[in-house]
């Protein structure tokens, strides 16, 4: 068994800075060549502390950014202009990607479409709400105004 210090997050194994024991072949053929880990040494403990401190700083910064973006998203409604019939029924449906593009077009920052949750299928003109998961601890509810366009 090889004792390693992870330098990147590895699914099913651990996060950056964790000290793990893996089989020799996994270490030699996968983790070490891809620079996902370093061999453990006594001096490596100092490296572990610096990696953990950097990870904590990144987490804190991403949390602050997510909170700022959540406040901006909740400050004003986002307008989506979509094709609709005379009765207000849409040609198609509003998807997560449409919401993400509308948020970016409104100047409220860029969000990943996978973080948008639509509680109902939007198939007609009107006002709706969407949930956006910006961080594991931060979620925002945004108002969507779906209007008919050309």
From Swiss-Prot:
Keywords linked to the UniProt accession: Ribonucleoprotein, Ribosomal protein, RNA-binding, rRNA-binding
Biological process per Gene Ontology, one example term: translation
Any Gene Ontology CC annotation: ribosome
Listed Pfam families: Ribosomal_L9_C, Ribosomal_L9_N
A GO molecular-function annotation: structural constituent of ribosome
Cross-referenced Gene3D superfamilies: Ribosomal protein L9, C-terminal domain (3.10.430.100), Ribosomal protein L9, N-terminal domain (3.40.5.10)
Highest taxon of the lineage: Bacteria
NCBIfam families: L9
Entry's family note: Belongs to the bacterial ribosomal protein bL9 family.
Function according to Swiss-Prot or TrEMBL: Binds to the 23S rRNA.
Protein name per its UniProtKB record: Large ribosomal subunit protein bL9
Organism (species): Pseudarthrobacter chlorophenolicus (strain ATCC 700700 / DSM 12829 / CIP 107037 / JCM 12360 / KCTC 9906 / NCIMB 13794 / A6) (Arthrobacter chlorophenolicus)
Encoding gene, per UniProt annotation: rplI
């Amino acid at each position: 068994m090889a004792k390693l210090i992870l330098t990147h997050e590895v699914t099913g194994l651990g996060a950056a800075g964790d000290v793990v024991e893996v089989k020799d072949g996994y270490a030699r053929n996968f983790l070490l060549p891809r620079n996902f880990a370093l061999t453990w040494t006594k001096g490596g403990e100092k490296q572990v502390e610096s990696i953990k401190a950097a990870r904590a700083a990144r987490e804190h910064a991403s949390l602050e950014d997510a909170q700022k973006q959540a406040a901006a998203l909740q400050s004003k409604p986002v307008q989506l202009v979509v094709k609709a019939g005379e009765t207000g029924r849409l040609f198609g449906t509003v998807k997560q990607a449409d919401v993400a593009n509308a948020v970016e077009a409104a100047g409220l920052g860029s969000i990943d479409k996978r973080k948008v949750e639509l509680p109902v299928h939007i198939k007609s003109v009107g006002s709706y709400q969407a949930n956006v998961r910006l961080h594991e601890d931060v979620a925002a509810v945004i108002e969507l105004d779906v209007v008919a366009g050309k």
